[in-house]
Amino acid sequence: MDINSNYSEEDNPLALKADFILSLCELVVGGKEGLQPVEKTVIDRCVHVVYRKYFENPTPENMPLLEDLYNALLTQDEPEARHVAAALEIYVKGSLNIFNHHSNVDIHNRIVCFDIKQLGKQLKKLGMLIVQDAVWGRVTANRSAGKSTRYYADEFHQIGRAHV
């Protein structure tokens, strides 16, 4: 759930991060229809709540975790919020909680390698979405700094297969 001030080319990086988190929740909640409008609303509301502390003091330890979103959803009155929180629970407290930690990837290195080969079937799509988000954050930060970015994807066909 990492974000930086250059995350978006627009004035509001939080709007783009909220869109990413909606996509993440769409994968987690699943279903043919995707997220319902009320679910999207409570997720968006909670995203703004959990990032408030970080934007007041943008230090790595204040970066929100998936668990912060989960806890914020549990405080909402709408039953849809509890439905989304229940779907997130396995990714927060359960056996698929691999992404509920601060990142150990130093995105500021000249070369960054993301290896998601060992992710199981349940985490593969989520892992690819998170990698794409991290790459986007790096590309926008580099663009703001006037740097070019090269992006190499091995096994690129896996990205297309995940969306089928």
Predicted regions and their residues:
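P-loop NTPase motor domains
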Residues: 2-163
